[in-house]
Amino acid sequence: MKLIVGLGNPGFEYEHTRHNIGFKIIDKLLDVLNLELNKSQFNGLYVKHDDFIIAKPLTYMNLSGNFIRQLVNFYKIQIDDILVIHDELAFNLGVVRLKQNGSANGQKGVANIISQLGTQNFKRLRVGIKNEDLKNIASFVLSKFAPNELILLESAIASASVIAYDFLKSNKSFSKLMNEYNQ
């Protein structure tokens, strides 16, 4: 059973912020698969299909790990079958990269997941949100995208949803996916 979780913050006020790009990608993936989040459990929303689960935590980003840990335990999901989609401040807007494992790189939602799962050996799909205005990081990640950024944003969401779909539906190894998409 594979698990894809998009990170973001719940609530209308955060809907179009940089921090919620993980939610946006989940929405696009659900559209492609003609699915909707239909289960509410463990303080999150998800849909369980035959061999995968797609989910969004309903906690604030920095507390996402508890929801993921509960899904993993309940459905007996292997750590190697988890893909977490999140914003990446280290990448320019529009850059999309897969990562096998490793540190949180300052991303507090990922840090909480590492803490809750007791491992950093889960897969990530990191989506760049950086622009040149990084005076206050906390304010920046909770800011909305500027009109001139929307084309790059839509392109990143489309690319990331294709990668997430490939993770779910193909039999390619993660190394092969990284070689194919991390260019």
UniProtKB/Swiss-Prot annotation:
Question: Where are the active-site residues found?
Answer: 19 (proton acceptor)
Alphabetical keyword list: Cytoplasm, Hydrolase, RNA-binding, tRNA-binding
GO-annotated molecular function: peptidyl-tRNA hydrolase activity; tRNA binding
Site feature Stabilizes the basic form of H active site to accept a proton: at which residues? Answer: 87
Q: Does the keyword S-adenosyl-L-methionine apply?
A: no
Q: Which residues bind tRNA?
A: 14, 60, 62
**Protein name (Swiss-Prot/TrEMBL):** Peptidyl-tRNA hydrolase
What are the top taxonomic ranks of the organism? Answer: Bacteria, Bacillati, Mycoplasmatota, Mycoplasmoidales, Mycoplasmoidaceae
Its annotated compartments are: Cytoplasm
The function of this protein is: Hydrolyzes ribosome-free peptidyl-tRNAs (with 1 or more amino acids incorporated), which drop off the ribosome during protein synthesis, or as a result of ribosome stalling.
Per its record, the protein catalyses: an N-acyl-L-alpha-aminoacyl-tRNA + H2O = an N-acyl-L-amino acid + a tRNA + H(+)
